């Protein structure tokens, strides 16, 4: 029994140790190793195929702020806006001209976004709705010249009057014309002022303009972004170092930007937002470089979440407060003067796009309260206007995300241009967009069957081993306790031998022994001596054993 108790104790202890080591140490390392070998941008892998051409469209929503009192605002009144939308588009993402560098473990490519209007999802909106917005060309040129080239104001004012006859501070046009088809810009005039201004169109400095013939251009917010090159990236493939998967190394063949007033703001941090490395820690955040903003933005962990029954982590981001973060002072017009920094929740895009544009969260969510107070019709709230991503960190899979951004005109009075002379200084919201994705069951099942079933198997196995080992340990302990509580009496071998010898003596020996005992009794009996007055004839003497 003692041998069995020891074996049971050893087996149970070994099972307990194996369950702990395998469940919490070995299995996670094995899983991490397997994922690191599969999740790379090496040619031929599933991840490379999905990354290079997204097999499903993203949802792209556009919400427009229709100005309902344009004449009043032009005369210095408070703007009043009405949100119109969403206009829904299917956005397809693909990468082309891919070039791998095995030595550097990088891949270079051109990014392309293609938009298709989704009539069904946009209904009842058709895209032909008439919208009133700040005039994108008149406002941006007039304000930029006043701030940076005031000496040229007279020439520019004359050119604008020729190119944009009868232009007003606010432009009223159909949604599709404003955003995709374009509004006409006439550069056919032979006037010197007109030719001087139109030079920026012919050289391509106005990125939102598309040349249709020798003298005319079409200007739109997103027309030039549709099915065109969005920039050339160079990113890490993650073969040699999986932690660097997707990290941007170069953009436009440059290792960093050169437009901001500090290295911290010019650095590339994170990926191109279409892929993330597996095994990221919560405190690392999710960083991505955004060419539209000419900067990198990082989402921070907020809380645990779930998607289709699978656990995930929710990350959120906003524009922050540049004034309060010393590392971001390079985004100010003058890093030494905090008064030149943008308001909380905004970012000045003038250096990025060459115009008085301000980026923010939709409806100025999480921004300076003054931004909302200056415009009627805004209603910021977390559910509709927060940027978030539900992320599975082990595999690096984003389950669902909503990337939202609002674009605003940084308006101010322009003395040199009559239509803009009396307007008030205000950050005027124009439109906001949402790029959303939700993985369907086809792709969530891939994660579920390859990752979470393995995790569940590991959890079940380790707890089963621990349970059985604890039962075994308790059983062994009970057996030890039971045996130690009982008393085993063992006679010495010599006594046992003598006892057996006496027990085996023949009958005559026992009779002889009995006779000897009788003789001894008689010898020890009291002598028969007469005592006067005492009759001892009838006295019986009993022999008693002495103990």
Curated annotation (Swiss-Prot):
Residues 506-531 are annotated as: Disordered. The keyword Signal does not apply. Glycans are attached at residues 66, 213, 226, 440. It comes from Drosophila grimshawi. Belongs to the CD36 family. GO terms for biological process: sensory perception of smell. This is Sensory neuron membrane protein 1. GO terms for cellular component: cytoplasm; plasma membrane. The lineage of its organism: Eukaryota, Metazoa, Ecdysozoa, Arthropoda, Hexapoda. It holds the Pfam family CD36. Keywords: Cell membrane, Disulfide bond, Glycoprotein, Membrane, Olfaction, Receptor, Sensory transduction, Transmembrane, Transmembrane helix. One of its GO terms (molecular function) is scavenger receptor activity. The chain crosses the membrane at residues 8-28, 461-481. Plays an olfactory role that is not restricted to pheromone sensitivity. It is a multi-pass membrane protein.
